[in-house]
């Protein structure tokens, strides 16, 4: 992998804000921060295309006392065995549980799984976090 140097023209104030942020985040130079921004854009583009193989997590908080939420949650996980890689279950208190579901597959299908999980009655909050499989990222 070769490195290419290029120039960017931006307002001074924007650069100063950027420098402050990357210093706060622990970057040692602008180049690595810019590379990470570009990588993030590539990953988001993969998800938008829908046909790319992607990875991610679906995190939900739900009330396990709610009628059928546990059964429906398990049924959905079994329905998508090829896409659901793993799950972590945490008891938050006597009523609420946190579930982190690791997924890998085509972006459109992963979004569909997340939508179905997040819309279950009894789910209080949820979020799909999208990332890459790492295969095509440099």
Curated annotation (Swiss-Prot):
Pfam families: NikR_C, RHH_1. InterPro entries: Acetolactate_synth/TF_NikR_C, ACT-like_dom_sf, Arc_rbn_hlx_hlx, CopG, CopG/NikR_regulator, Ni_resp_reg_NikR, Ribbon_hlx_hlx, TF_NikR_Ni-bd_C. Keywords: DNA-binding, Metal-binding, Nickel, Transcription, Transcription regulation. GO terms for biological process: response to nickel cation. GO terms for molecular function: DNA binding; DNA-binding transcription factor activity; nickel cation binding. Ni(2+) binds at residues 78, 89, 91, 97. Belongs to the transcriptional regulatory CopG/NikR family. This is Putative nickel-responsive regulator.
């Amino acid at each position: 992998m070769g490195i290419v140097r290029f120039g960017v023209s931006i307002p001074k104030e924007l650069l100063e804000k950027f420098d402050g942020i990357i210093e706060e985040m622990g970057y040692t130079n602008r180049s690595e921060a810019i590379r990470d921004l570009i990588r993030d854009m590539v990953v988001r583009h993969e998800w938008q295309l829908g046909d790319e193989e992607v990875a991610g997590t679906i995190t939900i908080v739900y009330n396990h006392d709610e009628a059928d939420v546990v059964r429906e949650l398990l049924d959905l996980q079994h329905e998508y065995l090829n896409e659901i890689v793993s799950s972590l279950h945490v008891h938050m208190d006597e009523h609420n549980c946190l579930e982190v579901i690791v997924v890998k597959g085509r972006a459109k299908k992963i979004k569909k799984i997340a939508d179905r999980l997040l819309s279950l009655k009894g789910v209080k909050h949820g979020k799909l976090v999208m990332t890459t499989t790492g295969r095509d990222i440099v």
